């Protein structure tokens, strides 16, 4: 079944209808030689087993063979999850440990995703853009090229409350730490959002905004550009 992931209601339907998954990893010492491992990925040497699969299937095996099991350890990182995480193996970007990126996200060349960042379904991260520590890009949030999304900043998504228009951050924008960009807002090219600001209306190109709610305080000048310039070495 196909879904139009540009529509927040379609995204919600996709999540609703997705098969929920509770994958686990089990390390087992014991005799499981007579077990049926259909639908379970198994690695073993003698009586040592590593099993990957859905919790209900692996737990049935453990329960049925508990008298033959000497030791068992289970690792679990989600429950009834609707959307898998993004396969990052073929992405040409720097993605640090602890970043959480859901499937159906686009990551541009030489982007940087730092520890603790969260990027939701349908988001787009442009070439050379940095999503700093603990920043959040909500569903369908769009960040252009060479954007800096500061630590703890939030680009709101379209899901709840539902919004037909995603947040759009155009090229060469700098968003300071802990700033919040509300649903459907557009930040024009080259603009700067000061740390801690709450942006409730669209921002034109090449201006500096600050405050809660954010207001234009000046145009971007040479001094501003010097203070907010990005470091190319961080993107290589």
Curated annotation (Swiss-Prot):
Pathway: Amino-acid biosynthesis; L-lysine biosynthesis via DAP pathway; LL-2,6-diaminopimelate from (S)-tetrahydrodipicolinate (acetylase route): step 1/3. GO terms for biological process: diaminopimelate biosynthetic process; lysine biosynthetic process via diaminopimelate. It is an enzyme of class 2 (transferase). It holds the Pfam family Hexapep_2. GO terms for molecular function: tetrahydrodipicolinate N-acetyltransferase activity. The keyword Plastid does not apply. Keywords: Acyltransferase, Amino-acid biosynthesis, Diaminopimelate biosynthesis, Lysine biosynthesis, Repeat, Transferase. Its EC number is 2.3.1.89. It catalyses: (S)-2,3,4,5-tetrahydrodipicolinate + acetyl-CoA + H2O = L-2-acetamido-6-oxoheptanedioate + CoA. The keyword NADP does not apply. Belongs to the transferase hexapeptide repeat family. DapH subfamily. PANTHER family: 2,3,4,5-TETRAHYDROPYRIDINE-2,6-DICARBOXYLATE N-ACETYLTRANSFERASE (PTHR43300:SF10), ACETYLTRANSFERASE (PTHR43300). Catalyzes the transfer of an acetyl group from acetyl-CoA to tetrahydrodipicolinate. This is 2,3,4,5-tetrahydropyridine-2,6-dicarboxylate N-acetyltransferase. It comes from Clostridium botulinum (strain 657 / Type Ba4). The lineage of its organism: Bacteria, Bacillati, Bacillota, Clostridia, Eubacteriales. The gene is dapH.
């Amino acid at each position: 079944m196909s879904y139009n992931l540009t529509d927040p209601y379609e995204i919600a339907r996709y999540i609703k209808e997705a098969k929920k998954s509770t994958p686990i990893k089990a390390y087992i010492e014991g005799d499981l030689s007579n077990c049926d491992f259909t639908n379970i990925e198994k690695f073993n040497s003698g009586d040592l087993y590593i099993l990957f699969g859905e919790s209900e299937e692996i737990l049935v095996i453990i329960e049925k063979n508990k008298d033959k099991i000497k030791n068992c350890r289970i690792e679990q990182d989600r429950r009834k999850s609707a959307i898998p995480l993004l396969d990052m193996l073929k992405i040409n970007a720097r993605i640090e440990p602890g970043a959480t990126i859901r499937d159906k996200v686009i990551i541009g060349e030489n982007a940087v995703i730092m520890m603790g960042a969260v990027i939701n379904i349908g988001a787009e991260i442009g070439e050379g853009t940095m999503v700093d520590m603990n920043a959040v890009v909500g569903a369908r949030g769009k960040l252009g090229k060479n954007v800096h999304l500061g630590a703890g900043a939030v680009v709101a998504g379209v899901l709840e409350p539902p919004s037909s228009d995603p947040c759009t951050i155009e090229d060469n924008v700098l968003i300071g730490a802990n700033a919040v960009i509300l649903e459907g807002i557009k930040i024009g090219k080259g603009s700067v959002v000061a740390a801690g600001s709450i942006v409730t209306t669209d921002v034109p190109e090449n201006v500096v905004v600050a405050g809660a709610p954010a207001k234009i305080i000046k145009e971007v000048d040479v001094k501003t550009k010097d203070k907010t310039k990005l470091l190319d070495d961080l993107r290589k």
